[in-house]
Amino acid sequence: MKFSTTLLALTASIAAVMSADSSAAASGAASAASGAKSGATSAASGAKSGASSVASAAKSGVSSAASAAKSGASSATGGSSAAKSGSSSGAGFAPVAGAGSLAAIAGLLLL
């Protein structure tokens, strides 16, 4: 009977130790997996951030170039507009003078 009790206690102790070892191994594996996942997430985040920075810089460069080109085109258009305005006022002067002359002649006829 004493031998059975000792054997039962020894079996219970071995089971407890094995359970603790198994639990520690599972915990270690979970910790390692978590560390690997965290490292992978950090690497992916860093790569994404770097790609975003490069894309942002490229977009900014394209915007600046487009803005400069647009500004140049506006200046050219503005010059064209000034030339058009000058020619319009030059062309507009003759009809006004003609209308004034007609009004002067009509005024003289009324006298």
From Swiss-Prot:
Gene Ontology CC entries for this record: extracellular region; side of membrane
Reported modifications of this chain: The GPI-anchor is attached to the protein in the endoplasmic reticulum and serves to target the protein to the cell surface. There, the glucosamine-inositol phospholipid moiety is cleaved off and the GPI-modified mannoprotein is covalently attached via its lipidless GPI glycan remnant to the 1,6-beta-glucan of the outer cell wall layer.
GO BP term, example: cellular response to neutral pH
Domain of life: Eukaryota
InterPro entries: Synuclein
Species for this entry: Candida albicans (strain SC5314 / ATCC MYA-2876)
Task performed by this protein: Probable cell wall protein required for filamentation at low pH.
Gene: RBR1
Localization of this protein: Secreted, Cell wall; Membrane
Triggers of expression: Expressed under acidic conditions. Expression is positively regulated by HAP43 and NRG1, and repressed by RIM101. Expression is also controlled by SUR7.
Propeptide part(s) removed at maturation, as residue ranges: 82-111
Region (Disordered) location: 71-90
Lipid attachment, kind GPI-anchor amidated serine: 81
Location, primary (coarse class): secreted
Official protein name in the record: Repressed By RIM101 protein 1
Alphabetically ordered keywords of this record: Cell wall, Glycoprotein, GPI-anchor, Lipoprotein, Membrane, Secreted, Signal
Signal peptide range in chain numbering: 1-19
Gene3D superfamilies in alphabetical order: Helix hairpin bin
